[in-house]
UniProtKB/Swiss-Prot annotation:
Lineage: Bacteria, Pseudomonadati, Pseudomonadota, Gammaproteobacteria, Enterobacterales
UniProt-annotated site: Important in sugar transport, residues: 142
HAMAP family cross-referenced by the UniProt entry: LamB (MF_01301)
Gene Ontology terms, MF aspect: maltodextrin transmembrane transporter activity; maltose transporting porin activity
Cellular location(s): Cell outer membrane
Membrane disposition: Multi-pass membrane protein
GO cellular component, one term: pore complex
Underlying gene: lamB
Pfam families, A to Z: LamB
Source organism: Enterobacter sp. (strain 638)
This protein's name: Maltoporin
GO biological process per UniProt: monoatomic ion transport
Length: 444
């Protein structure tokens, strides 16, 4: 009987311990989902200019997307600690109740803080991680993002700023090969593209203003005995300077970036260009040799008790040796009028203009969204939010990229820019459309 009495007591103690541990788990994340319709019929369509790397997102997102983050400080002694962080992401087309999808395992890393006595405040980390990402929320555009599996040492106090060092990887399919048979190369093996990142941040250079400088070097790291296709982009650099100014209860960020060769593709710090394309059974290099210039200004500010404003203006010039580059400029605003601390009206107006280096033709689009929103707070950043919206888009396009896969057109290299002709159309043409719906968005 004494033993039986001890069993409930032991279970109670164990439950208490598990509850305490469970309570220490950090549950964070992001999600968006909704329903929408298109004016001409059918489910909601989303609108993005051909050649533009992003779109204005308010009332213009057609998927359910979620990131579920679980993390916990697993050890702490004084100011030294270890933190384990994970992130699993899901994306579906939001067309049915049951939509099966394979999750993307985006983060799994450990961060050790203050482990080096002579570098107080610094953090050692290793694993898959979203690493110090820089983005424009309004257009969901990441202009400095080397996320992936990696390792690094960050936030080293150098007196006038914080120094961070990191190395990450982004593999590219179909980039390298050894001899397959009869001295013929079969380019199907992925290539490991490495990025080495150095950045100096939090340099106070004026009242309320800080400067961040960064350099990224990317290279294709082919296996021993394997070779890259002739003309592949083997390496490249990206340099970034960003000034952040605190102003009007918000911020303004001014960014200058320059990239070369393998770092020009996405222009955000990931190395690409070692893969190949195939046209008429002939392999050719999908290289990114050339350079990129980007000038960007964006921010979010408060214009009194009743008005908030997001804005962006950007010019980007990707000049490639293959002539497959673009000149893209975009400008947009999103004012918010607050009727009450939890109800607001938003208007988003955005314009994109993309000129093809190969064809000399231009695609353009403007998009307008009006939304009525209920949110948890009186800031333009307040979430969760539930909104109903109506979106109108008008575009005029004259060029596009040749399709790949089953839609490949004979005589046209997939991924290469071509002008529309009377026989073949590569763009969306000249048209307009409108959509409407409801959406929730949350981060926590």
């Amino acid at each position: 009987m004494i033993t039986l009495r001890k069993v409930p007591l032991a279970l109670a103690i164990a439950a208490g311990i598990l509850s305490a541990q469970a309570g220490a788990v950090d549950f964070k994340g992001y999600a968006r989902s909704g329903i929408g319709w298109t004016g001409s019929g059918g489910e909601q369509q989303c609108f993005q200019a051909t050649g533009a790397q992003s779109k204005y997102r308010l009332g213009n997102e057609c998927e359910t997307y979620a990131e579920i983050k679980l993390g916990q400080e697993v050890w702490k002694e004084g100011d030294k600690s270890f933190y384990f962080d994970t992130n699993v992401a899901y994306s579906v087309a939001q067309q049915n109740d049951w939509e099966a999808t394979d999750p993307a395992f985006r983060e799994a890393n450990v961060q050790g803080k203050n482990l080096i006595d002579w570098l107080p405040g610094s953090t050692i980390w290793a694993g898959k991680r979203f690493y110090q990402r820089h983005d424009v929320h309004m257009i969901d555009f990441y202009y400095w993002d080397i996320s992936g599996p990696g390792a690094g040492l960050e936030n080293i106090d150098v007196g006038f700023g914080k120094l961070s060092l990191a190395a990450t990887r982004s593999s590219e399919a179909g980039g390298s090969s050894s001899f397959a048979s009869n001295s013929i190369y079969d380019y199907t093996t992925r290539t490991a593209n490495d990025v080495f990142d150095v950045r100096l941040a939090q340099m106070e250079i004026n009242p309320g203003g800080t400067l961040e400088l960064g350099a990224d070097y990317g290279r294709a790291n082919e296996r021993d005995g394997y070779y890259l296709v002739d003309g592949a982009s083997k390496d490249g650099w990206m340099f970034t300077a960003e000034h952040t100014q605190s102003m009007l209860k918000g911020f303004n960020k001014f960014v200058l970036q320059y990239a070369t060769d393998s770092m020009t593709s996405q222009g955000k710090g990931l190395s690409q260009g070692s893969s190949i394309g195939t046209s008429d059974n002939i392999n050719y290099a999908m290289n990114n040799n050339g350079h990129l210039w980007r000038v960007l200004d964006h921010g979010a500010i408060s214009l009194g008790d009743s008005w908030d404003l997001m804005y962006v203006g950007m010019y980007q010039d990707i000049n490639l040796d293959s002539n497959n580059g673009t000149k893209w400029w975009t400008v947009g605003v999103r004012p918010m009028f607050k009727w009450t601390p939890i109800m607001s009206t938003l208007l988003e107006v955005g314009y994109d203009n993309v000129k093809s280096q190969e064809t000399g033709d231009t695609n353009n689009q403007y998009k307008i969204t009006l939304a009525q929103q209920w949110q948890a707070g009186d800031s333009i950043w307040s979430r969760p939010a539930i909104r109903v919206f109506a979106t109108y888009a008008k575009w005029d396009e004259k060029w596009g990229y040749a399709p790949s896969g089953n839609n490949t057109k004979a005589g046209y290299n997939p991924g290469v820019a071509y002008s529309d002709t009377s026989l073949n159309s590569f763009s969306r043409g000249d048209n307009d459309e409108w959509s409407f719906g409801a959406q929730m968005e949350i981060w926590w």
